[in-house]
């Protein structure tokens, strides 16, 4: 076969191998350049997106609410991932070796666990906050004070430290001697893997799944109730129910069933002034408020699916690999490409969080637009 190939091509097998080597090198170089460009783009999007979230909450008045402190904490966690974890990961993959020594390797890995864990735990706290706001809006509105929110945020970061620091205190299987050829990887000490994966992902995943399921079913129940109310509102109001109450009072009555939702855009004063103060207009006004609320709750139910779906898709592959590999001694270890892919898939969640948690919010979109246009009317 080799002689036939040489006579057809006019080149021997060694010559063919030598000519194929540059092609392989060029292909590998192209893949490296493309992958690096993609990873740098992810870092840039993560930094810009989360920075916009933080600046918007502190500079745009409609966003200066207590519940948005949770979103700021999430954005800070995701921003630290982009600033302190991802750049070193890119450099490590490009050089294919760790050149910064044992101490910086351990600090980098600890920072990785800390930042990613705090991001996931912030998602969990946001889920709990939404659950309490929907299921017990009146009481929770009184309990949701700045002090309580700050305490919850501090607890998230403290728990993240408790989960991430033990390897620095000796709970690890890192080699005693560290050279340039020593890989800088997370410890595979089995008890710590169980401890950290449970606290960082699996327990928050269970909590978020239960909470979002309860939110979803509570939302469906409220949708059914409001649909029935709309059916009763469809009956024309009798003449004797004519009312001349001020519009502000009517808004208060109509919004009693919608206390946990943001208010719709206010109508121009001219259009308000044109409304007759009779029973028919009151009926139409309340019906419209109910329809707006129904639309918002349907949208909120869809957003819940997006939030949970993206979180699971991004982080589940990594934590399955992280939790299984140390215990499967007879299994073939995953390739470096697989490890890199599932690791960066988890990191991508930090770039998607500001998009998911803000793209459905008109106030955030307005704040982003004004910031990007350098509009001074932010406050």
Swiss-Prot record:
InterPro entries: GPCR_Rhodpsn, GPCR_Rhodpsn_7TM, Octopmn_rcpt. It is found in: Cell membrane. Residues 5-36, 91-107, 172-196, 326-340 are extracellular. It is a multi-pass membrane protein. Residues 59-68, 129-148, 219-303, 363-375 are cytoplasmic. It comes from the Eukaryota. Disulfide bonds join 105-184. GO terms for molecular function: octopamine receptor activity. Probable G-protein coupled receptor for an amine. This is Probable G-protein coupled receptor No18.
């Amino acid at each position: 076969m080799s002689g036939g190939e040489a006579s057809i091509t006019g080149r021997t097998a060694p010559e063919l191998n030598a000519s194929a080597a540059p092609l392989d090198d060029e292909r590998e170089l192209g893949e490296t350049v493309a992958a690096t460009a993609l990873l740098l783009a992810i870092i840039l999007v993560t930094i810009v997106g989360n920075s916009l979230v933080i600046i918007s909450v502190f500079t745009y008045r409609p966003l200066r609410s207590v519940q948005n402190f949770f979103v700021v904490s999430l954005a800070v966690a995701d921003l630290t991932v982009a600033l302190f974890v991802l750049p070193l990961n890119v450099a490590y993959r490009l050089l294919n070796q760790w050149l910064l020594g044992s101490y910086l390797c351990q600090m980098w890995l600890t920072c990785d666990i800390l930042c990613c864990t705090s991001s996931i735990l912030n998602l969990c706290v946001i889920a709990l906050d939404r659950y309490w706001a929907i299921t017990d809006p009146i009481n929770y509105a009184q309990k949701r004070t700045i002090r309580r929110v700050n305490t919850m945020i501090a607890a998230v970061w403290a728990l993240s430290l408790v989960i991430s620091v033990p390897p620095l205190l000796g709970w690890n299987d890192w080699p005693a001697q560290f050279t340039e050829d020593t890989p800088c990887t997370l410890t595979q000490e089995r008890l710590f893997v169980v401890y950290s994966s449970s606290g960082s992902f699996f327990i928050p995943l269970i909590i978020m799944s239960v909470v979002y399921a309860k939110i979803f079913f509570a939302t469906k129940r409220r949708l059914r109730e409001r649909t029935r109310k709309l059916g009763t509102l469809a009956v024309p109001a009798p003449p004797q129910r004519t009312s001349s109450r001020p519009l502000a009072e009517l808004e208060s009555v109509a919004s009693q069933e919608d206390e946990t939702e943001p208010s719709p855009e206010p109508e121009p004063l001219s259009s308000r002034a044109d409304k007759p103060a009779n029973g028919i207009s009151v009926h139409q006004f309340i019906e419209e408020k109910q329809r707006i609320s129904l639309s918002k709750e349907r949208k909120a139910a869809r957003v819940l699916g997006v939030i949970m779906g993206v979180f699971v898709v991004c982080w589940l592959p990594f934590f399955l690999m992280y939790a299984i590999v140390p215990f499967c001694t007879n299994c073939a270890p995953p390739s470096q490409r697989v490890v890199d892919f599932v690791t960066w898939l988890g990191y991508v969640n930090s770039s998607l969080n500001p998009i998911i948690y803000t793209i459905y919010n008109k106030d955030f979109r307005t704040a982003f637009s004004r910031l990007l246009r350098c509009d001074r009317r932010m406050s």
